[in-house]
């Protein structure tokens, strides 16, 4: 269960202003859940480079502090917030803190996610099933619902679904189900929020050199995988599209083909 929550700016003093202060995204307020490592970290750093005020949220506060310090050294603005997306009170506290400090949210990146050691359905524990679904699907729902009152026309939601939203990996029933469910939630949000001028984008990356891939496929050829930074570059490009247009889905695969 989540511990005490707090909002803070990195203790590291910025050394310089971001080079991209003229970016279309400069001054936007962005929240990245699961921002302490992997793809979440890469997206948070890319947003900060564009001049966004980035809130990075997650359970590993020490790791979040490292990301915040890295962003600050590069001249960006990062704010750390402890949050367990499975816990409704923790999510509501996060929303309250963002509203109090910034008053609005322009970009929401739902990136928090976990996976468990592979197990066939007949060997999968109820506890493991619930933990994955609660994090990857219910967590996305709780965060989005809590943040929507602060999001207005021109805002964007990006949900990281992973390639498991489009295919299945045997032995990963909970993860597959959570991502397929997240795809359905994302598609629903897109239609519900279209009249409000809020864009909703599905992020569907293939093999990316992140902790989850390293954990479950340690022998996979890393040289054929995409880097988190390359995915973040595509995300930034989508965010910079004119408000009158949107990319509904970003399905990104390695140039070298399947592993």
Language-model regions, residue ranges each:
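Substrate-binding pocket helix/loop in short-chain dehydrogenase/reductase
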Residues: 119-121, 125-130
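Active-site helix of classical SDR
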Residues: 144, 178
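Residue(s) in the substrate-gating loop at a strand-loop-helix junction
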Residues: 162
